[in-house]
Amino acid sequence: PICTDRVVASDIEHPNDHTAPSEPTITFVEDTNPKDGKLNKAENSSDGDNANTTAKISIPTDAVVGDVIKYTVNGGAEESHTITNADKTAGHVEIKVPVTDGQTSSVTAKIVDQAGNASKEVSGSIDVDTTAPKVDVETVTPVDTNNPADGNPDKGIVKGHSDEPNAPVVVTDKDGKIIGTGTTDDKGNFEITTDPIKPGDKVNVEVTDKAGNKGNGEGTAGDIEHPNDHTAPSEPTIT
């Protein structure tokens, strides 16, 4: 009888390759408006998935098809992704990262080549803030500054409060035109001087937090005030 032995080749060994690949970079693709390391509600909603955001792990130029990206998400178990031709062409891979309002989401990543050499591990994180500020408009006052008063408002004063201190405030009229700007104080209070407004005019007050979330409140102008008119009218005559 003739006996035939079959030998199956094992994986290629690389005994002389001791060079680690370059490290990747990590970016969060929804962090765009503004790009500040914070994820606001509008950014997180841009792809319709409010439970996750997308992280992009770059593929360095010296990484090749068959090398492995090892990564973790939010401190979880290490996962592996073998680089494909499509990945190499794109120059990156994308992974889903769960997000929770008020918490920080994080990713670590490194490249391991086919000789087992590992790049430096890099990390990236994003602070998640998807809660808009609360805005309470307390008074909207037309002001006639003339002495004597002529009944025509020269400006408006809008007062209120937000739960966001030291934040920009924008006041607009019913048509969306900006009529005043300012900032909340360290307790969240604001007093904004505006263009002239009349009794009954409606205004919108928008407060933007540090993550870019926008909160809104509305108010209606009351009666005209005349703070500078201290002149008594002439007395009448009686006949």
How would you name each of these model-derived features?
Residues 88-93, 184-192:
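Glycine-centered loop-to-beta-strand initiation motif
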Residues 82-84, 179-187:
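Short, acidic Ser/Thr/Gly-rich low-complexity loop/linker segments typical of extracellular
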Residues 95-104, 193-201:
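Surface-exposed, short loops/turns at beta-strand junctions within beta-sandwich domains
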Residues 107, 203-205:
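Hydrophobic beta-strand segments within extracellular beta-sandwich modules
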Residues 5-31, 113, 123-138, 144, ...:
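Flexible, low-complexity linkers/stalks enriched in Thr/Pro that connect modular domains
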Residues 51-55, 154-158:
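Structural beta-strand segments of beta-rich domains
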Residues 60-66, 161-167, 198-200:
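Short proline/glycine-enriched turn/loop motifs at strand-loop junctions of beta-rich domains
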